[in-house]
């Protein structure tokens, strides 16, 4: 289903996102307008505009309550979710509940607004799409978007919805470690040797995944996956922030906790110090006037940073052990350990991992920040039918991260699809009634590994009615679970005797956005986009009239023009320029056409005088009399 134009791969990260495109037989990771190959997953709302990416992150200290980040830690979760509740303690912005779903609350253009996490993520995706469009010089319609391997069904659905709101045709949702494995596998293409067991250790800003794959002749088969959808670089920052806030309190008897701006400035300094500590053993922190005029100058050693995070760092090995157990592999059977995600640059994490694998060298051949987007771009090319030899013989076999099943008598979880089953997949099992003359059955679908459904996660439920009266155990009800390549589930139940069936696509019951919601958000996204564009045009018009005014002013004040222009004409221009400058000071928020009108007004006064000046100027060359002024459109 090749859409028009190339398809892109987007790594939608917790803290940073990255976009790539596969063309001319290779992947390009695309830099944004600031020249950065990763873009902060930040959206800020101000009195006048909406900012996304670097611009949003750069102003966060001035505007902490209206700058949203970490949408990925909210997406597809319930407001009551314990992790959401604990995260809210760290966030400077407000999270409120609407129908059990979390929404962020901000003040935008003087009004209170609330947004679902899908909407915030769609704004980040829009930015990534625009970055790609600027580079490719055309519209982009299709994309592959990545998610942590351990994301559950509702988190995947919500991510797909975010893509839809952006106006993208989401070709597929793929797992981040799988995408990284493609990047690694392509990188290693042509190396000798048959099947390889590869462990991908992916520790990013907010999530942690471990996946074990076998790669053989372009076939990538995921054997197992484990992880923590809630562990990453930000958690390491949090530990340092708490530690230094305590130190500040001890030294200066002041608690910065309630002051969001101070906490934010400290966090930014901590993030920078953490990066420094990956290459140096000590980092200094210098923040002028952190709180109530008190400067905060201190330093932190690598050893101290490691001690603050010792339990978190050590904890990264548990999912590694679990993934090995699930793949039925011994650690000696892993041929390659591939590091992905910025947090894998931390020396202590590398050392723990290397020691766990008895000193085996870690593979650092792929850029940890870009590998996921790289793999997603390759997968996008495959899905729209790219025929270049590098990708045509790649096959990606992914797995479902959690077991899926239904509740049977006594609240027992009966799995139909075991975790780590390769997808797409379809499984059917026959069930029967529990009591005599039972005319309907309730099919309740769960995901999880526990024996009782109450400990697992309810995905959805439906009734199959109209079962003819019969003794218990006689009716035969066939339940089919069908998972597509995106990991999205359809469940069907059919009564064999009557052929009656009912089915559910696991979506809405898990707090997924309805079609109407998505359509509304698509329109709103368009509206915000056009507002952003209108604002850009407005600012451009303002800058144009401003630079025109100052240029004219400089031209007539130029010493070289003395004697070529009458004092009367000169004063006429200068008075008009001053009038426009005063008007600009008072009207910073005027409309585009008002600025254009002001510029034309000024031109009407200046043009006759300036043209007279250049015609009448000596030598008739005209251009020697100072800068010529072009109208800025």
From Swiss-Prot:
Record field: compositional bias (Gly residues): 616-625
Q: State which residue ranges cross the membrane.
A: none
The record's Gene Ontology biological-process terms are: male meiosis I; male meiotic nuclear division; negative regulation of inclusion body assembly; positive regulation of ATP-dependent activity; positive regulation of ATPase-coupled calcium transmembrane transporter activity; positive regulation of G2/M transition of mitotic cell cycle; protein refolding; response to cold
Q: Does the record's keyword annotation contain Membrane?
A: no
Q: Which residues carry this modification: Phosphoserine?
A: 403
What's in the GO CC field? Answer: CatSper complex; cell surface; cytosol; male germ cell nucleus; meiotic spindle; mitochondrion; myelin sheath; nucleoplasm
The record's subcellular locations are: Cytoplasm, Cytoskeleton, Spindle
Query: What gene makes this protein?
Result: Hspa2
Return the annotated region ranges for Disordered.
613-633
At which residues is Phosphothreonine found?
408, 414
Which amino acids does the record list as binding ATP? 13-16, 72, 205-207, 271-278, 342-345
Which CDD domains does this UniProt record tie to the protein? ASKHA_NBD_HSP70_HSPA1 (cd10233)
Entry protein name: Heat shock-related 70 kDa protein 2
Q: Which InterPro entries match?
A: ATPase_NBD, Heat_shock_70_CS, HSP70_C_sf, HSP70_peptide-bd_sf, Hsp_70_fam
Identify the PANTHER family for this entry: HEAT SHOCK PROTEIN 70KDA
Record remark on domains? The N-terminal nucleotide binding domain (NBD) (also known as the ATPase domain) is responsible for binding and hydrolyzing ATP. The C-terminal substrate-binding domain (SBD) (also known as peptide-binding domain) binds to the client/substrate proteins. The two domains are allosterically coupled so that, when ATP is bound to the NBD, the SBD binds relatively weakly to clients. When ADP is bound in the NBD, a conformational change enhances the affinity of the SBD for client proteins.
User: What is the scientific name of the source organism?
Assistant: Mus musculus
| Complexes and interactors | Interacts with FKBP6. Interacts with ZNF541. Component of the CatSper complex. Interacts with RABL2/RABL2A; binds preferentially to GTP-bound RABL2. Interacts with SHCBP1L; this interaction may promote the recruitment of HSPA2 to the spindle. Interacts with MOV10L1.
N6,N6,N6-trimethyllysine PTM positions: 564
User: Which sequence ranges form a coiled-coil region, renumbered to this chain?
Assistant: none
